Amino acid sequence: INYDIPVIVEVQKWFESCIVKNYANPIADRQIMFSDDESYRKKIVRALNDVDIDVSGYRYDEENHELYTQRMIEGKIYELSFNDESDGTKKMIAALPVILLALQEGRLVIIDELDAKLHPKLLRYVISLFKNKNVNKKGAQLLFTSHDMTTMKNTVFRRDEIWFAAENERHESEIYSLYEIRRENNERVNSTAAYDKQYLEGRYGADPYLTNMLAGGEWL
């Protein structure tokens, strides 16, 4: 069979270009972060500054395999071990290299539980990078899982951008978008609806235990 068909090759290359962020394996991220490209390193620092992580640079000690963030205080540079940073700062520093790479090259980046240990404002900032056409000039995409409710709003996402995972009767996970959900009158969920509030009310197929608790029922 001849697989050398232009459209198939193009699709294959697209899948190969996808970036899967794995916090358990930071080696690839380090290779990106410690690139010799000075302009790229400046972009990482600028992005950190944008979310109030006040660093002026960073340094990697190859001998001890340790990362240090640098801060300018009264004209002097002070260093802090990456391990001593807050969990939110560490996660942001770990995620930024692949996020910026995706934006720079127009790729898809996949991140599991992006909101974990991340302040809601930082999460919204990451999302805004991909939704801002002046920043995301090459059509990069972000696919992430989250339990965060603060971003489940019509001002942040369209209905077709929000997807739910629910267990069916065979204990299989099924996914469906908010756009697919129909109300009792067979109309779609309004694009101006309070998505977070309606989700907690169980209108989108909320977890049955959550629905029961919110209704004041017994759950133990």
Model-identified regions with their sequence ranges:
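Phosphate-coordinating catalytic segments in nucleotide- and nucleic-acid-processing enzymes
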Residues: I1-A94, L100, Q104, Y195-Q198, ...
